[in-house]
Amino acid sequence: EPTKEWDSSATNATAKPIRMDAIDVSAVPRFHTGDDELNRVLGGGLVAGAVILLGGEPGIGKSTLLLQLALQLKKKVLYVSGEESQQQIKLRASRMGLAEDRCYVLSETETQRIFLQVQNLAPELLIIDSIQTLHSSHIESGAGSVSQIRTTAAELIHYAKSTNVPVILVGHITKEGSIAGPKILEHMVDTVLQFEGDR
């Protein structure tokens, strides 16, 4: 069976308007991250179908924070890394001393192959580390280009919205202090978090 492309042509559903006062937001599922401060910043936890962009300088701890989140959650998590091997991630995870039986690790950069694994695994949270390493076979340019970042982000956003699976994207910061890639990326996602700290 061919993989779902998670684009608008993949769904047959017709969108219908709902009067604002008839929309039930009490049913919007949120799940706690296992970190009180992160829950507070996210307004009470991760929202189903939300896309979060976590930006920060290289080496500041974005990957470590998200790996810790993946291991603390009592949910099935797929952690996709375009920067580290599965063995490197396992070594970092082992040092944390947290349960590893619900976290799956994939070293991959092509979105079509990632979506094939997502379809097979059906994770409850998808973490992409990082958006700048991804590429779509539908676009000619290389990973990290403006068109690749825009396209791969759009594919992941459509996936999140159509499945209600939250997606966290890691974004690297340039020397100027902005997230690398097109400025539109920050407008495409639901939440942008800037991770800062002392090294």
PLM regions with names:
Residues 3-6, 10-20, 119-121, 132, ...:
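Conserved P-loop NTPase
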Residues 53, 79, 127, 169, ...:
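Structured core elements
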